[in-house]
Amino acid sequence: METSPPSPGPEPYEPITAEKKPGEKCYTMIFFPTALLVLAAGVLIRAYSDPATHASQRLPRAEIPAQAQFIDQKGFNVLPTVPPPSVSNATTFFVPPGYDAEALKEKPFHVYDEEFCDVIGSNPTLTLIANAGPHPLFHEATTWYPPTDEMFFVQNAGAPAAGTGLNKSSIVLKIALSEAAAVSSRRNATGSVNVQTVDSSPMVINPNGGTNYKGQILFAGEGQGADVPPELIVMNPVEPYNTTVLLNNCFGRQFNSLNDVSINPRNKDIYFTDTLYGYLQDFRPAPGLQNQVYRLNDVTGAVTVVADGFSLPNGVTFSPNGSHAYVADTGANRGFWGWNQSYPATLYRYGVQEDGTFENRKVFAFIDSGVPDGVHCDSKGNVYAGCGDGVQVWNPSGKLIGKIYLGEVSANFNFAGKGRMVICAEENLYYVTLAASGGGYIEA
């Protein structure tokens, strides 16, 4: 991960760094270029050469589509050489025996279990629809607005390549999904859709998470400096894009750096995460609260804590019926402070009680590449997360069933109803067609 130098002052966590020592064994690595991201890894690809393993792979019972490939996990349970943590870690891509980096990207739908075939269907597609060069325009808050069939998203707040954070706010953008579909329909499709800037008024400051909310879009704003507090702010998705602040304090205290937000489909309350990335990226002051998950009842105005005990809580979402919550902990990624591999890169699952509180925290999944950032469910309850190598997918029991493999970091993505998905990958924007439907809450 390439980052800016850390700011003066006490370091909240000690990052792990690795250097090659004299006499240390070298391992063959393929370097793969990546965006300069705040929540992303400067990626190394760790590869193992064993063509025979690839040739003898066992296929699942379901037929594999042309754009998919089966990944035999048993084929890499034992490796001839296992590199040390300085070489193989959360900031690297794992290339199974018999593959190389290009082979993994050539057929980007990776089937780890035949259940994934039901997710992708018989003819899935992955299309690059926009590239922003060195600018991380395609970051988070991926939110579909059905009346205009547009997908909204936000620029990376705090990314050095964008110059955003303390002196300049990140911005809201959108695309028309009709344009994305037109590009995707071409043979060997690649192209560019029109990416429009959304000039909200008053401006949403450093937006990060986003979700549908009563026919509008609800953003989690990270704040800016000591004088602009983090906010939950509602934006009209059509011109004049007027905004209204819903919440900007916890009993008179500033939140640390609001990150993501989701609506529980059962009780309709707002749940959001508060974390340290504004501080770790040098555009927010030292934290004044624990890193926690909050609940807002917008009828009574009551704000309550529903979960704590995180390193850095991040994405949050709910199962389609609202009975379970999923919260990402991206503690391994310390922003400008680097990485601590012993910290969480984990999805947790909670039961949501009838009164809206959380119970029975369980580890749902540990991420093999990067950290789990944005999290969403499909209509069948499968769980998706933006990770270091693309979008990873688990069934409701926490079994990894597949990946939409980009070979680069995705911080967030979202469904656009049935059979469509948009994936944000910082400099790149992708359009996906598949069989699954979104399971998120949308109220017109």
Predicted regions mapped to residue ranges:
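Short, low-complexity, Lys/Arg-enriched N-terminal segments of secretory-pathway carbohydrate enzymes
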Residues: 1-26
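Blade-level signature of beta-propeller repeat domains, shared across WD40, Kelch, NHL, RCC1
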Residues: 412-444
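Beta-strand-rich domains and repeat architectures in extracellular enzymes and scaffolds
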Residues: 58-115, 120-170
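Conserved beta-propeller blade signature
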Residues: 150-152, 216-220, 269-271, 324-326, ...
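Beta-rich catalytic cores
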Residues: 137-138, 168, 204-206, 228, ...
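Asp-box/WD-like beta-propeller blade repeats and closely related beta-sheet repeat scaffolds
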Residues: 192-208, 220-267, 275-281
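Blade-loop segments of beta-propeller domains
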Residues: 133, 157-160, 165-223, 246-250
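Residue-level detector of Asp-centered blade-edge/turn motifs that repeat once per structural unit
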Residues: 144-148, 212-215, 263-267, 320-321, ...
